[in-house]
Amino acid sequence: MDLPYRPVALGLLALAFSALVWQRAQAGGSHYFPPVSDPVVVEECGSCHLAFPPSMLPASSWKRMMSELKNHFGDDARVDAATATHISDYLMSNAGDTGGRRYSDKLLRGTSTSKAPLRITELERWVGEHREVPAWEWRHKDVRSKANCLACHSGAERGYYDDD
Amino acid sequence: MKSQAGLLLLIAVPAMASASALAAPREDLLAGYAAQAKQDDPGFAGFSAARGEAFHRRSFGRGKVDTPACTSCHADDPRAAGKTPAGKIIDPVALSASPSRYADPAKVRKWFGRNCKEVLGRACTAQEKGDWLSFMLSQ
């Protein structure tokens, strides 16, 4: 049997490429991180700052975060044991190297999970993406904190962190 | 007639009971603070919304640097929304503006616990909590 190898190969290539694009489009590009959907996690992790998407950090980071709530970036953010277990389970199963892997591949590139980084804003990729933001903009009264994603990313609460 | 009156009672009593159950958590909170305040100071003479208002606006500067006062995060006007250092909007603290507030005692305990430490650098006394809450309930 004579197979038309070249057209078939080209066809497959085109198919693979569009599948890749389609997957990206569905995920909203590399700047989409699904927002927290669990009401307990939204309440407990989203009162002082935006409830950061679990896919922005590896599971090791969330584990460490939850074990250090007494000094949570200077605040005592302890919760009762049952709530803590609930939050830990959610964060760790949706983390950037577990359930949320498909959203985090770029953000966590170059991040060592064994180091369990606590600050999203110290991830190599995050720093690179925000290099062009001038110091005065960080100090602006409507920004003030690098944890204030929403100040510049108006879609942050819906999971979109595109360039604005 | 008699059965009608009975029917009315059947409707009215549960309605009254549920109304008081809805109002009770805030009163229970205040009663609890009052009992503690009396224990702390036998001369305790009740709570004052005016004292609570002064407390709300006072700059303590004994806790965290960026939160010297309640109004560092909550608005100066309790009926307006506040904002945390990380930019999160906080619903108004006045009951009239946020009618669901202060109904869950565990939540009230949690936030007094955290916020007093961050603003005053210590736990609030029962007198302080009762005064502040009285102010917010009156607003």
Task: State each model region's role.
Chain B
Residues A12, S18-S20:
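N-terminal signal peptide c-region/cleavage motif recognized by signal peptidases
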Residues R109-Q139:
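C-terminal capping alpha-helices of c-type cytochrome domains
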Residues G82-I89:
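Short cysteine/histidine-rich zinc-coordinating motifs and their immediately flanking basic loops
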Residues P25-G63:
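Electrostatic cytochrome c docking/interface patches
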